[in-house]
């Protein structure tokens, strides 16, 4: 009887430990050695270049492509922010089909569209950065619904039941909430994730990238911190991934919090110093000087149907010549670009793609050429959006080395 009692206590204790562990996110660390062992295991074959500043066909020219999506009928939607429209193409032939939207603030108009996402029924949600609204279009371009929002929508994901997962950068900074889940009537159902924990360490207004998988899990990555997080559809942090770099970066500590349900990011606060000098007239001029080492993270992320995680990261630091090869200046109707060297900006090789298993371990790597502002994965196709610098979308065929 005594042995049965001891056995029962042991089982109960194990169950308690298991339940506690179930609430804790898994932190997976990938070293530089792990990454180097996977070099070249992702094969990328360039299939087509969409757009580019040398494109002469007005229907195929983009001012600032921001993101793409492919529907079940093989139509490719390319969101062109500063042309204030969505251009639609046949993905196989490359032929132009139609344009959704034009500059304006009325129904079926668009004002600086930043992000798009397709519903299960084939409609298109568009987040208007300058319009402070999200708008639902039919595939033919008819406006079906408009929802006003308080902040600029910078990323939209559609769940399996057609709810919307939306990232508002200003809202995230002000509230600490990462993603808002809306129903189709524009009501906030819940929030998912935290922007960062300011009580532990203040992080400046850094940008993030997002993706959503076919189970409605949401992934986020910081552009200047080597951390990718995966949340369940109800907001539980399931996985956190870190990765090393082949050059010295700013020291950052990434650790689970006390409960294990979130990740704390700890780094030095004194990243800049103020230098005051006087000009010839004796007027004091203040200049901010950055003292820290480079800050790097995953600029862009994407998810395939097997829930493998793709992240665009920096492989090496740019040279001084590369840093000044191209410049961009914002304007109301687009970006003005100046290029000192076309070959550098079109073929720069400082970026690579890392692929992680659903469990968070790195499994493949590939070098890419050019810049990448966002990515989209459909089957064995990888679309890299190089919009800010080269005004184009690169379409690759993917395969993995066994």
Language-model regions, residue ranges each:
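Bacterial N-terminal signal peptides that target proteins for export
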Residues: 1-8
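Bacterial N-terminal signal peptides
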Residues: 8-16
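Eukaryotic scaffold repeat domains enriched in small/polar residues
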Residues: 21-402
